[in-house]
Protein backbone atom coordinates (compact mmCIF):
# COMPACT_ATOMS: atom_id res chain seq x y z
CA UNK A 1 0.00 0.00 0.00
CA UNK A 2 1.24 3.49 -0.84
CA UNK A 3 1.88 5.55 2.28
CA UNK A 4 1.12 8.90 0.67
CA UNK A 5 -0.57 10.53 3.66
CA UNK A 6 -2.45 13.70 2.82
CA UNK A 7 0.09 15.17 0.40
CA UNK A 8 0.11 12.45 -2.27
CA UNK A 9 3.90 12.55 -2.59
CA UNK A 10 4.40 8.79 -2.47
CA UNK A 11 3.45 6.91 -5.62
CA UNK A 12 4.87 3.86 -7.40
CA UNK A 13 7.90 5.89 -8.53
CA UNK A 14 8.76 7.47 -5.16
CA UNK A 15 11.82 5.62 -3.86
CA UNK A 16 12.86 7.99 -1.09
CA UNK A 17 10.90 10.77 0.59
CA UNK A 18 12.18 12.60 3.65
CA UNK A 19 9.60 14.68 5.47
CA UNK A 20 10.49 17.01 8.33
CA UNK A 21 7.40 17.28 10.52
CA UNK A 22 9.15 17.90 13.85
CA UNK A 23 10.62 14.44 13.31
CA UNK A 24 12.38 12.63 10.49
CA UNK A 25 9.88 10.60 8.47
CA UNK A 26 11.27 8.61 5.57
CA UNK A 27 8.82 7.01 3.14
CA UNK A 28 8.99 5.34 -0.23
CA UNK A 29 7.57 2.52 -2.29
CA UNK A 30 8.66 0.07 -1.12
CA UNK A 31 10.02 1.64 2.09
CA UNK A 32 13.70 2.46 1.52
CA UNK A 33 16.53 0.91 3.49
CA UNK A 34 17.86 3.76 5.61
CA UNK A 35 19.94 1.78 8.09
CA UNK A 36 23.36 3.45 8.06
CA UNK A 37 22.20 5.36 5.01
CA UNK A 38 21.08 8.69 6.43
CA UNK A 39 23.14 11.18 8.39
CA UNK A 40 21.63 14.44 9.63
CA UNK A 41 23.59 16.69 11.98
CA UNK A 42 23.55 20.08 13.57
CA UNK A 43 20.24 21.45 12.33
CA UNK A 44 16.84 22.02 13.86
CA UNK A 45 13.17 21.75 13.02
CA UNK A 46 11.52 25.09 12.30
CA UNK A 47 7.92 25.99 11.50
CA UNK A 48 6.55 29.04 9.74
CA UNK A 49 3.05 29.93 8.56
CA UNK A 50 3.41 27.63 5.54
CA UNK A 51 5.26 24.46 6.55
CA UNK A 52 7.67 22.73 8.92
CA UNK A 53 11.14 22.01 7.61
CA UNK A 54 14.71 21.35 8.68
CA UNK A 55 17.09 24.25 9.09
CA UNK A 56 20.77 24.14 8.17
CA UNK A 57 23.09 27.00 9.08
CA UNK A 58 26.59 28.17 8.26
CA UNK A 59 28.29 26.22 11.04
CA UNK A 60 30.77 23.39 10.69
CA UNK A 61 28.53 20.70 12.19
CA UNK A 62 25.33 21.55 10.28
CA UNK A 63 24.96 19.16 7.36
CA UNK A 64 23.22 16.06 6.06
CA UNK A 65 24.03 13.14 3.80
CA UNK A 66 22.08 10.38 2.03
CA UNK A 67 24.14 7.28 1.30
CA UNK A 68 22.63 6.55 -2.10
CA UNK A 69 24.38 3.20 -2.56
CA UNK A 70 22.56 1.77 0.45
CA UNK A 71 19.20 3.54 0.14
CA UNK A 72 18.56 3.30 -3.62
CA UNK A 73 18.09 0.10 -5.61
CA UNK A 74 20.72 -0.76 -8.25
CA UNK A 75 17.89 -2.17 -10.38
CA UNK A 76 16.22 1.25 -10.61
CA UNK A 77 19.14 3.66 -10.40
CA UNK A 78 21.79 2.35 -12.77
CA UNK A 79 23.98 4.18 -15.27
CA UNK A 80 21.81 6.17 -17.65
CA UNK A 81 18.58 5.65 -15.72
CA UNK A 82 16.30 8.68 -15.38
CA UNK A 83 15.56 10.23 -12.01
CA UNK A 84 13.86 13.22 -10.43
CA UNK A 85 14.87 14.99 -7.24
CA UNK A 86 12.48 17.58 -5.90
CA UNK A 87 12.09 19.43 -2.61
CA UNK A 88 10.98 22.66 -0.96
CA UNK A 89 13.71 25.18 -0.19
CA UNK A 90 13.74 28.44 1.79
CA UNK A 91 16.95 30.52 1.85
CA UNK A 92 17.73 32.23 5.14
CA UNK A 93 20.75 34.14 3.86
CA UNK A 94 22.21 34.95 0.45
CA UNK A 95 25.54 33.16 0.77
CA UNK A 96 27.59 31.64 -2.06
CA UNK A 97 27.26 27.93 -1.21
CA UNK A 98 25.94 24.59 -2.42
CA UNK A 99 22.78 23.54 -0.58
CA UNK A 100 22.03 20.18 -2.25
CA UNK A 101 24.68 18.40 -4.26
CA UNK A 102 25.65 15.03 -5.68
CA UNK A 103 28.91 14.62 -3.79
CA UNK A 104 31.88 16.54 -5.18
CA UNK A 105 33.65 16.19 -7.37
CA UNK A 106 32.23 13.90 -10.03
CA UNK A 107 28.60 14.36 -9.06
CA UNK A 108 25.74 14.81 -11.51
CA UNK A 109 24.18 18.00 -10.12
CA UNK A 110 24.61 20.89 -7.72
CA UNK A 111 22.03 23.39 -6.46
CA UNK A 112 22.39 26.35 -4.16
CA UNK A 113 23.18 30.04 -4.24
CA UNK A 114 25.95 31.29 -6.51
CA UNK A 115 26.69 33.76 -9.30
CA UNK A 116 28.85 36.76 -9.92
CA UNK A 117 29.97 38.98 -7.07
CA UNK A 118 27.08 41.20 -6.06
CA UNK A 119 24.61 39.18 -8.13
CA UNK A 120 24.05 35.92 -6.26
CA UNK A 121 20.88 33.88 -6.70
CA UNK A 122 19.42 30.40 -7.05
CA UNK A 123 21.87 28.42 -9.14
CA UNK A 124 22.00 25.04 -10.90
CA UNK A 125 25.23 23.45 -12.10
CA UNK A 126 26.60 20.23 -13.61
CA UNK A 127 30.01 18.84 -14.50
CA UNK A 128 31.92 20.38 -11.58
CA UNK A 129 30.39 23.76 -12.33
CA UNK A 130 31.48 23.84 -15.98
CA UNK A 131 27.78 24.30 -16.79
CA UNK A 132 25.96 26.60 -14.43
CA UNK A 133 23.53 29.47 -14.31
CA UNK A 134 21.76 31.77 -11.90
CA UNK A 135 18.05 31.27 -12.56
CA UNK A 136 16.35 33.48 -10.00
CA UNK A 137 17.01 35.97 -7.25
CA UNK A 138 17.12 34.33 -3.82
CA UNK A 139 14.52 36.03 -1.65
CA UNK A 140 15.19 35.40 2.03
CA UNK A 141 12.28 33.70 3.76
CA UNK A 142 10.47 32.64 0.56
CA UNK A 143 9.69 29.00 -0.15
CA UNK A 144 10.70 27.66 -3.58
CA UNK A 145 9.90 24.31 -5.12
CA UNK A 146 13.10 22.97 -6.69
CA UNK A 147 13.31 20.03 -9.09
CA UNK A 148 16.19 18.41 -10.96
CA UNK A 149 15.43 15.83 -13.64
CA UNK A 150 17.96 13.68 -15.50
CA UNK A 151 17.09 12.29 -18.93
CA UNK A 152 19.96 10.56 -20.74
CA UNK A 153 22.82 13.10 -20.73
CA UNK A 154 20.68 16.14 -19.86
CA UNK A 155 19.76 17.66 -16.51
CA UNK A 156 16.68 19.89 -16.35
CA UNK A 157 16.37 22.38 -13.49
CA UNK A 158 13.03 23.80 -12.36
CA UNK A 159 12.04 26.55 -9.94
CA UNK A 160 8.39 26.64 -8.86
CA UNK A 161 7.47 24.38 -11.77
CA UNK A 162 9.10 26.53 -14.44
CA UNK A 163 11.88 24.95 -16.46
CA UNK A 164 14.86 27.21 -15.92
CA UNK A 165 17.88 25.34 -17.33
CA UNK A 166 18.90 22.29 -19.30
CA UNK A 167 22.56 21.32 -19.05
CA UNK A 168 24.70 18.45 -20.28
CA UNK A 169 25.42 16.07 -17.42
CA UNK A 170 26.95 12.72 -16.62
CA UNK A 171 24.86 9.59 -17.11
CA UNK A 172 26.47 7.74 -14.19
CA UNK A 173 24.24 6.10 -11.61
CA UNK A 174 22.76 8.30 -8.92
CA UNK A 175 24.18 5.66 -6.55
CA UNK A 176 27.74 6.57 -7.62
CA UNK A 177 27.97 9.41 -5.09
CA UNK A 178 26.13 10.44 -1.94
CA UNK A 179 23.69 13.34 -1.86
CA UNK A 180 24.84 16.08 0.49
CA UNK A 181 22.98 18.87 2.26
CA UNK A 182 25.10 21.90 3.11
CA UNK A 183 28.43 20.10 2.70
CA UNK A 184 30.94 22.12 0.70
CA UNK A 185 33.95 20.77 -1.14
CA UNK A 186 36.20 23.09 0.87
CA UNK A 187 34.84 21.75 4.18
CA UNK A 188 33.02 24.95 5.11
CA UNK A 189 29.29 24.27 5.62
CA UNK A 190 28.30 27.86 5.10
CA UNK A 191 24.80 27.84 3.57
CA UNK A 192 21.75 28.81 5.60
CA UNK A 193 18.39 27.43 4.49
CA UNK A 194 15.35 25.30 5.36
CA UNK A 195 14.41 22.18 3.39
CA UNK A 196 11.29 20.00 3.34
CA UNK A 197 9.79 17.03 1.49
CA UNK A 198 13.01 15.86 -0.18
CA UNK A 199 11.98 13.23 -2.74
CA UNK A 200 13.87 10.93 -5.10
CA UNK A 201 11.91 9.28 -7.92
CA UNK A 202 12.95 6.65 -10.44
CA UNK A 203 11.40 8.44 -13.44
CA UNK A 204 11.71 11.79 -15.17
CA UNK A 205 8.58 13.32 -13.66
CA UNK A 206 8.80 16.55 -15.64
CA UNK A 207 10.58 17.85 -18.72
CA UNK A 208 8.36 20.92 -19.21
CA UNK A 209 6.54 23.34 -16.91
CA UNK A 210 4.29 21.82 -14.23
CA UNK A 211 2.28 22.67 -11.12
CA UNK A 212 4.45 21.92 -8.07
CA UNK A 213 3.21 19.46 -5.45
CA UNK A 214 2.11 20.93 -2.15
Where are these regions (language model features)?
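Surface-exposed coil/turn segments at beta-strand junctions on protein surfaces, enriched
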Residues: 78-80, 138-141, 172-174, 190
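A general structural signal for stabilizing positions within well-ordered secondary structure
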Residues: 8-9, 137, 189-192
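Extracellular glycan-interaction surfaces
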Residues: 29, 36-63, 86-94, 109-171
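Extracellular glycan-recognition modules
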Residues: 12-15, 24-29, 62-121, 155, ...
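Extracytoplasmic low-complexity segments
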Residues: 1-63, 210-214
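Flexible glycan-contacting loops in extracellular carbohydrate-active proteins
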Residues: 167-194
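Short structured motifs
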Residues: 65-73, 128-134, 182-184
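Short hydrophobic/aromatic patches on beta-strands that form ligand-binding or substrate-lining surfaces
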Residues: 16-20, 85-91, 146-148, 181, ...
